[in-house]
Amino acid sequence: YGAAAFARSVSADILTDLLDVYPAKDACTVMAIATLRIIRPSITAERMGTHYRRTFVCQHYPGAALSANTICTFLQKLGQDGNRRKAFYQKRAAAVIASHHIAIDGTLKQDSSTVNDLSAFSYKARRKGCQEVSVLYAYDIEVMEPICAEVFPGNSIDASSYAAFIRDNDIRRGIIVSDKGFPPSQSK
């Protein structure tokens, strides 16, 4: 009970923002999946439904269908609905207190999927022999809370990906955390 109750208590504002953008069933499904992944970080999609029914997560977020196939379909639909995702991100960004700092950072994640058109060989990945995607995200430094995230092709230049990320998510202030893939001329 404790872990699920704690997760619910610190994420109530996220549920409120989700309910403003998504249908109630979808918002509860997002929160159920997120809560289960927090409580059990290594949980697989096949076990998620079982743990959902065995924990208080089903009491907090009722009506979530969490079979492995349903989760996959739901997450694909969620990821493809760019307008709602953008509306949710804008609500989260608007909630950031003016005195707080926003960090914009990115990382490369291995992804050798044959069906993902974002998977590509980055500069470093060519030596390793695996494809990657570039995940960019913005978060509030003071409260250590994510604001938004977006996936880019693994072979894209950091400067162009960051510019598109900032433009797409209408980020007006922030600190860019960059590395050697970001030319000094682009860091204005």
Predicted regions and their residues:
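Dynamic "connector" segments at or just before major functional cores
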Residues: Y1-S113, L136-N155, A163
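Active-site-adjacent structural elements in folded domains
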Residues: D17-L18, A120-S122, A159-S160
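Surface-exposed loop/turn and secondary-structure junction residues enriched for glycine/proline
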Residues: N69, K124-R126, N155, S185
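Long, contiguous hydrophobic alpha-helical segments, chiefly transmembrane helices and signal peptides
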Residues: I71, S134-Y137, V177, F182
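A general structural signal for short secondary-structure junctions and capping/turn motifs
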Residues: R92-V96, R127, D168, K188
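Flexible, glycine/threonine-enriched loop-and-boundary segments that flank and lead into catalytic domains
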Residues: D111-K124
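Single, function-defining residue in the core of a domain
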Residues: I141-K188
